């Protein structure tokens, strides 16, 4: 049946096959002489490429093949195997055909890099370039390694490009530009980099990830020079990691009206300079309010995430630092710069579930300063170890006639509270809600997650009745303190448990333990309705 198909139909069939597996065109060519003739007479229509990769004798066979475009693939990303030492001759044999190289995906070692200066001329047909240093070494490419105007994708990891802005300027067709873990010697001025982006109307992804602080900061000490902004109309994803001043100088020079995803991580600095960041975000063509903001404190970072419900737009900004007071100081500075934008936020959440320990001299005013930026917030979600401190700070501010979150209507408590911490936490919730009601600004309270946690098995419950039922069914006659999950005692020495309660959990009503262990009834001086 296949013998009656004309050549044009066979070419279309081959094209569909090679769209999925482009490197296997030679398999089709070995089926029969007729197919081989069709393939070699349609190299452009079938986008034929010679794939130079592991376990292929490139050096010995390259000159015997037709002069097809070359794909050099020896690593280039953490997911791919790096080249072996015996691959270096094959790699260089392919790279020396620079005018034919269409794509390079390469993990570069120091020994391989030493051969790069002999590469003749530019990679004039290069469309895709992905380079990664081997063994986390910081490498600098020789000036002889450069490309032409056809480049569409550039990825690098721990690779420094001499005069990168000059190299990028001709690459007007770039779609994807990701430079990660840029070594100190690879720093380039933000203004020159912005100028190099001029005319890149197809650029969709831009990612800059600096490995460390710049070796010299002379070009970052002055404010960004005035000038026309570079418009990147197709840019939808922008990611950055480095110091705030570099970011500020860069975003002062570019407009990206259709950005969808923004991911920024700033190095820890006492003073953050991001005065142009708010204007940059405001120039993004997003639909109007309401916006949702989530502030998350973890052991090593604090982040603010801004999303727009109903869209895929997302801005995430992280600051790398460990101490909670430093985290708050940094995020407050960022919120000051974003204040023209944040006043539209109607849904605010603060989660300190994974935060580091709170300093003893922690100033509650830092929480107040943070929340002052969200004067339009109608919904407030609070969770984590600092939930009690946050609500106390809100209550104290209200008492001092300094109303924070004046538009607040709904308080969502997302908290798993152990019995040890439940008393102070519940007091802070009730005090704040009562204060708002008395001031004529009632707040509706919602418990969104577990309020009680069994410390024996770490299971959380929203309702007290469910918590008690769990203790009866899962831990009957369990001689382990359910309030801390640490203290244990024997049945013959029940008095030790009561002593433990008095010293470690004085807020716990002793009669409640009868539900857990009826054997203690003779030791309880009074009774109490546990359901109250």
What is each residue range found by the language model?
Residues 451-452, 456-524:
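C-terminal recognition-helix end and immediately following basic linker
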Residues 1-450, 454, 458, 476, ...:
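Leucine-rich repeat
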